[in-house]
Structure formats: C-alpha cells, structure tokens
Amino acid sequence: MVQFYSPKKRPAKKQVKNLAVTANALDANGQGIAHAEGKTIFVKGLLPQETARIRLTEEKRQFAKGEVITRLTTNPERVTPPCQYYQHCGGCQQQHVPIDWQRTTKAEVLSHLIKRETNVVISAQPVIAGAEYGYRRRARLGLRYHPKKGLVMGFRQALSNDLVMVTQCPVLKPQLNVLLLPLWQCLKQLSVVRDLGHVELVLADNGPLVILRHLSPLSEGDKQLLDDFSHHAQVMIYLAGDNGEIAQLTTIEKEPFYQIEGLKLHFAPTDFIQVNDEINHKMVAQAIAWLDLSPNDRVLDLFCGMGNFTLPMAKRVDKVVGVEGVPALVAMAKKNAELNQLDNVQFWHADLSADFSAMPWAQEGFNKVLLDPARAGAAQVMSHIVTLSAEKIVYVSCNPTTLARDSKILLDSGYQLTQLRMLDMFPQTGHLESMALFIRK
C-alpha cells in the first residue's frame, strides 16, 4: 500500500501586538505602569502621564511587558540621562526618572509589600538618601577580547551577556571614574590580554585599589606595565590568578580601610563592604539610634561581616557578640576589634542556615539584636531570636520579600513593627534596601 504524507500546516507566526497606552504610575524598576485590554502593562522607559505606542515583549494572563516604539507625549519632569551608555548598559534603569520619584516609588512599594504580607500599615519614609550620582565605591567590570575590537572593558547589557564598553560611569565615585580610561589603555597592552576575566575597582579611605582576575600567568613585562600604572595613578594593584589567592603586585604597601563612627575598619580587597559609603554611615547611625544603646546592653549582631555594625555598637554597650558565616570576615572582624582597642566584643564563625544551638554564643542572653542577612533572609535564625525575648530588634535587609516573610515570625511572637525605612543605597537602579525596627510589646 502506498502511503501519502501530508505535512502538517505550520502554526501561524504569532503577531507582535502594538498598541497605544498612557502610564499612570511607576514601579520600583522605573517602568511605567499602564492598563489596556484588561491587563496591567509594564513599559520600560515610560513615565507617568506619558503616552506611547508600544510593542508587547511578553504577555501573560494578567499582565504584560512592553517597550516604547514612539513616545507620543513627554512628561516635562523627564530627566535627560547624564550617561552616554544609558539604555545600552544594564547597570542603571532609572536615569530618566527624577530622583525624588525614584525614592518615593521605592518607599511606597516597600510599604505596600509589608502591608500585603503582614497587614501592618506603616510608612517607609523619610527615605535614607544621599548623592544620586558619584556614590559607588566598588564595581566589577567584565573583560573580553574580540579579534576586531580588541579588549572590551565594561558592564553587561540588559538581558544579555554581551559587554558594553565604558570609559566613564557617573554612578562611580569620581576617584574611580577617572581610572576607567587609563586602566583600559594599560590592560589592552598586556601580553595575556586574551586571558583576562574581570577587573574590580574599590575606593578605600586611603586610596583606590584594582583587583585584576587573569586566567594565564602574567609576564614580567605585564607586571611592569601594571606597576607603572599603579604609581602613575596612585592605586594599589592586586592580582587574582587561577590558584584562588590574591597577591599584591605593587610596592605601595597600604592595607585598605574605611572609617565609620570614629573607627578604622581594615578589609581585604575581596571582602564585602557596603557599596555606598554615605548611606552606610547613615544606616549605622540609624540602627544605633533605634536600638537606643546604653552601657548595660548586651547586643547580638547576626551576619556581622567584618564588624560594620558590631564595632560601632561596642563603643556604647557592655558586650557585643558578632556571628558570621565567612571565616575570612570573622578573622578580619577580630583584627579590627584589636586595632580599635575594643575588648568587649567577641566574634564567632557559624553557619546561620544550620543548627547552631550548641555553640557557646547561642547559650548567652541578649537584650538587643541586629541582623543584616543576605538576600535569602534569616528564616533559620528567627526562632532563636524569638527565644531571646530581646527588647528591640533591628533588621537590615537587601531583599524586601524576605524581610516581609521574616517579619511575620516576629509579629506573631509578640513584636510590633514600629519603624521602617527605605535605604536608597543604589540610586538610578531598581535595587531596594531597607531597615526595620521591632519592639517587644
């Protein structure tokens, strides 16, 4: 029997939908919020009271995302972005949005989330804010060699792994911004230019440092080029090879540090420090004020890092215990306590996502608590915090979703959320950081 094959008809290619919308609000990422065809539509780059013809880039049952084809009307408050790479580089999302709009929107989003998850109505204002540009004291730039373009040094494009070559960045501290072009000119001369991974720039209080990740050994000529650059630009240079170790290249023997609350905190080149030093100062001061520290207090600082909160608190109380999961940060915290002649503080290494109940510090009593967890939050330590029955708890958060989740545990255990603040740690971006004060009823 002869069988005939009839190919199935290919489904018609789904047409991209274009429509005209008017935004009436902003989300935390600076996207305009519009409504059409029974859906909420998030439109990149559209401000409230602006109308545009848009193209839908993603469509779900209850919402859609769109991009502007043509803006038909312009809000007079629209800001001209100062960065030539804006909308190509993925680092910033809100340079077209007035800074007060950015802050108000983020604060409202935070308050709305807390209300939705906990039923607590509370304002996240006044916002803890600082400079809108020139604030970033740490940045990592990718390095990639192209046969035609040569060395590209820059940040990732939005929704892409491609790099956008940058020779200036207005959110960087000026002392770092001026290094971009001469640093690139130096790196592109290296013999291992095809085997570079990334470069980090950090501004310590005693000068800038550069950490270069290289995938092949540097020649003596390469090291000389870098050493010449370090002396000309007055920067400390560190090399990160395949062995995972960080080695200081330059003869400028200075250990990086920053100062806070009259203390000098040293850190290793790859140690975590808050990117925005102005907001960090204000955040630490706010936490100390909220805890209302006195000489008789015993304070527990969880996820303490190298002592950013711990050591300033130790100046004011009877005893502070800091607990951290990264051994290198614990070692640096102990060193900083000794250098600052603080003998009423102890630091412990512990995995705070595991059972730590048998550790000596977990047997102690504390009347005040501060915690500053990573994005995953502090779910595993909340039950221990509750058993302490501390008078006051300050929770510093880089993820409002996990803050809301962990807040419910405290609220259900007899605590009251009395203060909430949005920390504008990363202006021009969608990042939202916050801090909250809980008081035992």
Swiss-Prot record:
[4Fe-4S] cluster binds at C83, C89, C92, C169. S-adenosyl-L-methionine binds at Q274, F303, N308, E324, D351, D372. Signal peptide: none annotated. GO terms for biological process: rRNA base methylation. GO terms for molecular function: 4 iron, 4 sulfur cluster binding; iron ion binding; RNA binding; rRNA (uridine-C5-)-methyltransferase activity. The keyword Methyltransferase applies. InterPro entries: 23S_rRNA_MeTrfase_RlmD, MeTrfase_TrmA_AS, MeTrfase_TrmA_CS, NA-bd_OB-fold, SAM-dependent_MTases_sf, TRAM_dom, U5_MeTrfase_fam. It catalyses: uridine(1939) in 23S rRNA + S-adenosyl-L-methionine = 5-methyluridine(1939) in 23S rRNA + S-adenosyl-L-homocysteine + H(+). The active site is at C398. Disulfide bonds: none annotated. Catalyzes the formation of 5-methyl-uridine at position 1939 (m5U1939) in 23S rRNA. This is 23S rRNA (uracil(1939)-C(5))-methyltransferase RlmD. It comes from Proteus mirabilis (strain HI4320). The lineage of its organism: Bacteria, Pseudomonadati, Pseudomonadota, Gammaproteobacteria, Enterobacterales.
